[in-house]
Curated annotation (Swiss-Prot):
One of its GO terms (molecular function) is DNA binding. Residues 8-67 bind DNA. Keywords: Coiled coil, Developmental protein, DNA-binding, Homeobox, Nucleus, Repeat, Transcription, Transcription regulation. This is Homeobox protein 7. Its main location: nucleus. Residues 60-80 are annotated as: Disordered. The lineage of its organism: Eukaryota, Amoebozoa, Evosea, Eumycetozoa, Dictyostelia. The keyword Nucleus applies. InterPro entries: HD (IPR001356), Homeodomain-like_sf (IPR009057). It is found in: Nucleus. It holds the Pfam family Homeodomain. Signal peptide: none annotated.
Length: 80
């Protein structure tokens, strides 16, 4: 079965730059979308609202982990 863009779902979002762009752009403005915004994304991607919520949660978690790792690496002292 051949899928067109409208039939793709959120689990394929990382492999498609087209799909990711909308979510990434929105995330850069607002990391916590409201129910209506989540519903709009779910309709656009034709998937469950839960998948959209999980994408935003995962993105926030990855960002938090990345900033935490950057802080840890910046605070290392080396003595000779």
């Amino acid at each position: 079965m051949i899928k067109d863009f409208n039939e793709s779902n959120i689990r394929n979002i990382r492999s498609s730059g087209i799909s990711t762009k909308k979510l990434e752009d929105f995330f850069s403005i607002n990391q916590y979308p409201n129910k209506n915004e989540i519903k709009d994304f779910a309709n656009y991607y034709q998937c469950d609202e839960t998948k959209i919520k999980n994408w935003f949660k995962g993105k926030r978690d990855r960002l938090k982990k990345k900033s935490s790792n950057n802080e840890k690496s910046g605070n290392k002292f080396y003595f000779k």
